[in-house]
């Protein structure tokens, strides 16, 4: 549903297909945490389509010291001073995982684990960013949350 909502074409579609196939393979065969696979897929899809979040400095002011929030409106991690109403609280562990998922090679992007609380924070960030870029809520996300008990 997410891939179709972004409707990639041309070169974007060529880059999205291997990402989608890899994620589907992992969902079906790997035994990895399904929520983490979804998070990594969402983040990498955003990057492929040109919506790459800023994760190494404050997306608003450029501060590199502490980035305890993620703001889809600002376009990535933000410092305490630039925190906006849409911002999610994130830990350094979650931010490091997001950086890794964004920068790693296709073969390595899904090859890490996180504690459940960090996965939940990662999911909040990627879901909000996808919705911000699409300017709408995905009904399939609500269904998935209902099925997994995360509503």
What are these regions (language model features)?
Residues 1-151:
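Non-catalytic alpha-helical scaffolds and adjoining flexible linkers that form interface surfaces
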